[in-house]
Structures are given as C-alpha cells and as structure tokens.
Amino acid sequence: YGVRTTVLEKETYPYHEYPFLHQTGIFNVTLKDKVWGKSVNIICAFEADNGLKFSISIFRRKRDEKYAPGSSAIDFALEPLGTKFICTFVKTTSGFYKMSDAEYLI
C-alpha cells in the first residue's frame, strides 16, 4: 500500500517538502506518500489542487482499528498513493490540526 516501514524508508520521507499542516479548510487532495508514525498513527503527505503540499497525522480509531478520520470509512493505511480525496481539516482544542472528514473525489 506504499507505506514506508523500515528505518531507511522512514528516513527518506520528504518531511521538508510536506511540512505539517497549520491551517483549516476543505481541500481536494492527492495522497502522495505515507509513513508509519511513532505512535498508533500514519503520517500522510498530500498535495492540494491549489498546490499546497503538507503532511497530517491520522491516528488509529479504537472502535474499528482503521486509520481514518471522524466517521469516515476511508482507511488511509490501505489507500494507494495517487488516490484523490476531499478532506476537511480542523484545529483541535489543544492547538493541533487534524483531518476531521474524508471522502473520495470522483
């Protein structure tokens, strides 16, 4: 599924090209890369239709063990690179940014 898993693969994740997101909004995005995080999360790199490149961490839900935002059925651990989505990003009460919803862009 294109997830970087080995130490060497993780070291080559393009953090400099895809900095963590620091804004809210709804974006049409393409999944460009992904790597397992240090917790029960996957870090996904996206490129928005407007050219914005960013990463966001998606944590595993306890109820179904999917790496999915909110009530979305999309498990980003299983999605192939190049897949397009409409995603909503919000700022949490603790000041972090997260994906709150995702749908396939058709």
Where are each of the predicted segments found?
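Short beta-rich binding modules
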Residues: 1-106
